[in-house]
């Protein structure tokens, strides 16, 4: 089953993306580079739980 996750910016701006991932095939925490419009740069986004 795919679970909803939140990708939080490592730049500390508070910006986040939401996405889904398959926990069975990817049990580790996701980390991906995406664009942060607050700092207008590509930064690392790390997985966090949706509250």
From Swiss-Prot:
Keywords: Ribonucleoprotein, Ribosomal protein
Listed GO biological process terms: translation
SUPFAM superfamilies registered for this protein in UniProt: Zn-binding ribosomal proteins (SSF57829)
GO cellular component: cytosolic large ribosomal subunit
Xref: PROSITE patterns: RIBOSOMAL_L33
InterPro entries: Ribosomal_bL33, Ribosomal_bL33_CS, Ribosomal_bL33_sf, Ribosomal_zn-bd
GO terms for MF: structural constituent of ribosome
Organism superkingdom: Bacteria
Pfam families per record: Ribosomal_L33
Family: Belongs to the bacterial ribosomal protein bL33 family.
Family annotation (NCBIfam families): PRK00595.1, rpmG_bact
Protein name: Large ribosomal subunit protein bL33
Native organism: Hahella chejuensis (strain KCTC 2396)
């Amino acid at each position: 089953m795919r679970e909803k996750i939140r990708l939080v910016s490592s730049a500390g701006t508070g910006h986040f993306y939401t996405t889904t991932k398959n926990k069975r095939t990817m049990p580790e925490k996701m980390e991906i580079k995406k664009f942060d419009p607050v700092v207008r740069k590509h930064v690392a986004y790390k997985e966090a739980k949706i509250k």
